[in-house]
Amino acid sequence: MKIALPTLIAAVAVAGVAFTTPADTMEGHTSVSPQDIKWGPAPAMLPPGAEAAVLFGDPSKEGLFVLRLRFPAGYSVAPHGHPVDEVVTVISGTFSVGVGETADPRKAQHLPAGSFHVLRPGMAHYVFMEEETVIQISTNGPWGLTYINPKDDPRQKSQ
């Protein structure tokens, strides 16, 4: 029995499409394409102007979550700490981070796109961006941030 080559190619192509499942619909897996990211205002614990997008999990609940933050040029967060490890990947721009209870831009490390940084629990640090910057944070919730100086906390200013 002879099968024409065009018929065989068409059958293989149809079979390949029939058994291909996009990663974002596969049970137990999560995929987010850049065009599907939904940006909104960042949590109130951050100064106004930043935007956030939750890629995985829920920052308000216990468990792993992944969050993207987009900061405008000139944005900064006063010295603060977190209750658990934060794993930061710089997606675009330059993320400047310094360690200590007093912000000193001269002592900051400037991390370009593609950089990786881990912030340990309770470690006082400050961040600033001279250009628009996007970072990705992977950590465990509930997400917490405690300012070294409570007067720096934007949540206090809104009350």
Regions found by a protein language model. Give the residues of each.
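Glycine- and acidic-residue-biased ligand/ion/polar-headgroup-sensing regions
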Residues: 72-75, 81-102
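Bacterial N-terminal signal peptides that target proteins for export
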Residues: 1-9
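C-terminal segment of classical bacterial N-terminal signal peptides
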Residues: 14-21
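A short, N-terminal "cap"/entry segment at the start of jelly-roll beta-barrel domains
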Residues: 21-65, 152-159
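Conserved short histidine dyad/triad with adjacent acidic residue
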Residues: 62-82, 110-112, 120-121
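Short beta-strand His + acidic residue motifs that chelate non-heme Fe in jelly-roll/DSBH
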Residues: 77-79, 97-98, 119, 124-130
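Double-stranded beta-helix
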Residues: 28-32, 106-109, 126-159
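Short acidic-glycine-tyrosine-enriched beta hairpin
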Residues: 95, 101-122
